Amino acid sequence: MARKNLLAGLVDTAEIPHADVAPAYPMRGASKSMVRSLDELSRQAEKFLEGETVVELDPETLDGSFVSDRMGDSSEQFEELKQAIAERGQDTPILVRPHPSAADRYQIVFGHRRARVARELGRKVKAVVKALDDRTHVIAQGQENSARANLSFIERANFASHLEKLGYDRTIIGSALAANAAAISKMIAVIDRIPEETIARIGPCPAVGRERWVELSLLVGKTANEAKVKAIVSDPSFNELSTDDRFNSLFSGLNSAAKPVRKTTPKILENWQPADKTVSAKYSNSAKAFALSMKSRNAGPFGRYIADNLDRLYAEFLEQGNRKED
């Protein structure tokens, strides 16, 4: 197998291995250190499932969380998840609680996409049912989705703002998002400056980080720019752009120093899968970047194997005459 372009941008997106599902996660006070890594967040979220009985529920008996953390859903990512569950079954249960206001119904804490897949496949969904108060609900939801869902900055900021509007203090919001007080303050400030409709039109912007959103919020927040913002986001061509390009289009339209935005051509992804289908890989290649992502049962071990053999693989790459000329 050719080894060139095999290594850069490695991401392991395997679904969490099945766990026999956890007593309610012990809440930590403000004096305790804040969770700072995604690995730790992942372990925190899994504790909500450990030691509990996994049951099968009719997806039609499930209602969504009372606070949203996503701005739409990637149809491609959803279809990948749907195909994986159709082929292998649901590896990880979702977490639900008895609905606080509707008898014989449940409210999803986390696992909305898995529940949607089960509904579309006409299957029951594996779930852990746990009695949680609203506070524990939002912490569990925020921790699990921060660890698993690759939420963008603006999605996390929206989640933080929604929680504050529901009356939760910033200590709770920080616990849910594994963010310190300064980070939470910036998130909510961005949401306060940019109208909700404008954020909805721009979308989740997975490639846009905090500082650029802060810069945009300062531009949008200027009274002199109000008419210009409305004109840009209501232009029919605005909706034809990708979500990241919509951000760039608005930013450059408000910032005279910014470079004009060009509509980017989507990268074409290529797929690879062994005969036994124990791992699935997607990779894209451009002039300056190569990205590889893997999922399924052996994605983690195989990714670790590649990472552990980078020196050898790169040496073989150079031996095959791929050394860049000076």
From Swiss-Prot:
Assigned protein family: Belongs to the ParB family.
Q: Name one GO cellular component term.
A: chromosome
- What name appears for this protein in its UniProt entry? Putative replication protein B
Return the Gene3D superfamilies for the record.
3.90.1530.30
Could you tell me which cysteines form disulfide bridges?
none
Q: Which organism is it from?
A: Sinorhizobium fredii (strain NBRC 101917 / NGR234)
Q: Which UniProt keywords apply?
A: DNA replication, Plasmid
Which GO MF terms are attached to this record? DNA binding
Which Pfam families does this one have? Answer: ParBc, RepB
Q: What is the lineage of its organism?
A: Bacteria, Pseudomonadati, Pseudomonadota, Alphaproteobacteria, Hyphomicrobiales
